[in-house]
Amino acid sequence: MFNFFAAAPKGFEYSLANELTEFGATDVKESVAGVYFSSSLELAYRITLWTRLASRIVVVIYKGPCESPEQLYNAAYCIDWPSHFSNKKTFSIDFHGTGGFINNTQFGALKIKDAVVDRFRDDGDARPNVERVDAEFRVDAHYRNGQLTISVNFSGPSLHQRGYRSTTGEAPLKENLAANMLVRSGWQAEQVDLLDPFCGSGTVLIEAALMACDIAPGLKRQRFGFESWRQHNATMWNKVLEEAHARASLGRTRCKVKFYGSDIDPRMVSLAKRNAENAGVDELIEFSEMDALNVKVPCETGFMISNPPYGERLGNITELLQLYYQFGDKLKQDFGGWKVAMLCSDVELISSLKLKADKQMKMFNGALECAFNLYTLHANSTRRDAPVLPEGVDDIADIAPAFANRIKKNVKTLGKWAKKEGIDSYRLYDADLPEYNVAIDKYVDYVVIQEYSAPATIPEAVTKRRLSDVLLALPNALGIHPDKITLKTRERQKGTNQYQKLAEKKLEIITQEYGAKFKLNLTGYLDTGLFLDHRVTRKLVGEKAKGRKVLNLFSYTGSASVHAALGGAKSVTTVDMSNTYISWAKENFELNGINLKNHEFVQADCLQWVDDCREQFDLIFIDPPTFSNSKRMEDSWDVQRDHVALLGKLIKLLSPKGELIFSNNKRKFKMDIEALTALGATVNNIDELCLPLDYKRNPHIHNVWLLTHGK
C-alpha cells in the first residue's frame, strides 16, 4: 500500500473524499485543499486516470518533524532517490510553505535539491540535471508548523488539463470545477437531459457527457508523472488503460442522455464544438448560437447547470443585472419542473434572478470565491421570491417606482432647461430620495452613476439591494440600453489616488457646453474629464476673458482654458502637474479649432510654478484639490490650511485691474477673509452666481470666490 495526497481547489474536499472512497481508497482523510488516502499501485493508476475532481496526486515518501536547515537536508538525503528516478531524467523541486527557519520557498527547494544530488553522488552515480520549467520527475515538498512532507508527483501536469481543450475564451472554467458543479448539483447521480444556455467553450456539457458515457477524464492526456518514477509498473498501467478504453466504447453506445448548449457568441460556439469533437462526445451535444433570453425548452424536465457571465469575467454590471433579472423571469415562465444550478461570484447578480435557492454553496473559480446556488422551478409558477421584491412587484418597470418616477420627472424638467442652455451633459439626480443614495450624471446619450457612502446604521445588504434596484430601474426609466450606463465607486481621496485611472478600456465621447466642445472619457478614470458643477464658473471665466492674459492653475483637462480662449483671451496659460491632463487640454483646444500658438501649456508642480512665476495675469482661475500629497509635489497641499498662502502669492501675480476666481469643493471650507484683506485683497463670495440649476439640490457642492486688489 502507498500513501497519497490528492490536491484540489478549496471547497472540493468533501466531494473529492467521496469520490476516492467510491474508487476503493482507504484511510481517506480530508485536509485543506485536498484529501489524504491509501491505495495499491493499481488503484492509484485507476484513480489518477478516473478522478474528475483532483488537480494533482502525489505519493508521500517522507513525513516528519523538521526544525532546522540540517534536519531538512538530512530528511531529504535519507530518501533512496536512485530507487525513485534515474539520474538520466531531469528533475525539479516544488516547495510550498514558509515559517520558522524557512524564510522563502526557494531556500527550501535548494536544500532538498542539494540533498538529492548529494545522495546520487554518494551512491556512486552521476548527478541528475535540474529543469525548473518542464522536468521529467517532480518532487513535491510541503512545510507547515514544523512538519515536512516530501512526495513524488504521481499525476504530472494538473489533472484538470484533460487534453480536449483547443483554446479558451475570455473566461475559461476549469474542467474539475465544472465536474464538481455536476457532482454537487446532483446531476451526476440523476444523469438526466442537461442544458447550459451560457455554455462558453462547452466545459460543463463536455464534462457531463464524459460522465454519462463512462469515459475516463484522463484518457486524452499525453503524459503522467509516474512514467518517470522507477516504481512504475507499465504492464499494470496498460491494463488500467485498456479497461478504460473498453468502458468508453461501451458507454458511448449506451448513453441515452441528451445535452444542449448555447451561447450568444458564435466564436465560443465554434470553440465548444471543437472541444467536444476533441473529447469524442460531439455527437451527443447539440450546440447553437443563441441569446440565453431566447433559449427554447428542449424537453419537459431536466437540469440546467451554468456559469453565466459576471463582473470579474465579462460585461457591464448594469447590463448583467438586467440580464440576470430577465433570465430569472425566463426560468420562471418557461422552465417549470426543471432543476437549475448557477455559479456566480457576485451575490447581487445572482440575487437579481429573484429565485429562492434550495441550497447555497461556496466554490472557488481559481482564487475567486463564487456562490453555487441550486433551485427547483415549480411547474406553472411565475411567482417571484417575495422577500427580494416589494409586494406586488412582478415586472422590472415596477422596481423602485418612486425612484423611476423621480428620474422621469427630472428628465422632463432638466432636459428642457439643458436644451435651452446649450448643454448636453448635466446632473440628472443627486440623492433626491435618501434611500437611493446615488448621483446620476447624463453625458450626451450616456449615464454615469456614482454611489455615495451609506450611513453606518444602514446594513450593507440593504444598500447593495437599493443600488441593484437603481441599476435595474434606470434603463427602463430613461428608455436607454443598459450598455449606456456606467457605475463608478468613489473612495476617499488619498494622495495620488485623486485622479486614479480605472481601466485600460476607454469610452470617449464629445460633449457641448455653451458653444464649447470637450472630450470625455466615461470609463478610464473616476472623473470623466469635466466637472459639471463648475459649468457656470467656466462660462464666467469665458465672459471675463476678452483681451486679457489668463492663467488656469490646477487646470485638470483645461475646460476653463477653452472657455477663456473662445471668449477672446489674449493668451491662456494652462498649468497642471499631470502630463495626461495637459495633453487632454491640448486636445480640447484643437477640438474647438483654437490655435495653440498664442497659448501656453505647462506640466509642473503648481505650487512650485507659482513660486517661480514672474509674469502678471489679468484673470486667474484656480480650482485646487481639497488635499494632495503627490510624489511629484515638493510639499503636501491642504486647501483649508494653505489657501491664504497660495492666494497671497497669486494676488501678487494679478495685474492692477485683474480678477482672481478661486473655487474648491471642501464641504466645510472657511475662507480667511481677514487674512486675505490684510494682504491687500478684496474678497467676495459668488456661490449663488456660480451654482447651476442641476446642482440647486446640493448648494454646498463647491465654494467660489472673486478676489481683486483692495481699494
Swiss-Prot record:
One of its GO terms (molecular function) is RNA binding. Belongs to the methyltransferase superfamily. RlmKL family. This is Ribosomal RNA large subunit methyltransferase K/L. Signal peptide: none annotated. NCBIfam families: PRK11783.1. One of its GO terms (cellular component) is cytoplasm. The keyword DNA damage does not apply. It is found in: Cytoplasm. Residues 43-154 form the THUMP domain. It holds the Pfam family UPF0020. It catalyses: guanosine(2445) in 23S rRNA + S-adenosyl-L-methionine = N(2)-methylguanosine(2445) in 23S rRNA + S-adenosyl-L-homocysteine + H(+); guanosine(2069) in 23S rRNA + S-adenosyl-L-methionine = N(2)-methylguanosine(2069) in 23S rRNA + S-adenosyl-L-homocysteine + H(+). Its EC number is 2.1.1.173, 2.1.1.264.
